[in-house]
Amino acid sequence: MGVPMGKSLLAPLTFLALASCCFAAYRPSETLCGGELVDTLQFVCGDRGFYFSRPASRVSRRSSRGIVEECCFRSCDLALLETYCATPAKSERDVSTPPTVLPDNFPRYPVGKFFQYDTWKQSAQRLRR
């Protein structure tokens, strides 16, 4: 009435196989070098392009290493890779954002010499009354 040897190993082996798949899927980061690093950056950044060193506005105070130092010699993740993506330049033909339109109830105040003329005109009308 014992359990056959094959069936007794089935449950632990199944668990081991599932556990190894899950751990591989949740691996937080990996090292990328050479062509693999460039291919990954092209995939992540797409049409925006990328920099090998971060733009000055994105460099943290604690480090100013380039992507090779960060991803090839150490491990890097998707968030770090995205910091090296270039921001797209807005072209004249870009119509993704509509032009700013003032609402109808926006107060319009006269400026310049016309303002002085309107002030003089209002004063003259008051004097006539």
From Swiss-Prot:
Q: Where is the signal peptide?
A: 1-24
Which residue intervals make up region (D)? 87-92
- Keyword Amino-acid biosynthesis in annotation: no
In this chain, the stretch annotated as B covers 25-52
MF terms (GO), sorted A to Z: growth factor activity; hormone activity; insulin-like growth factor receptor binding; integrin binding; protein serine/threonine kinase activator activity
Propeptide stretches are 93-129
Name used for this protein in its record: Insulin-like growth factor 2
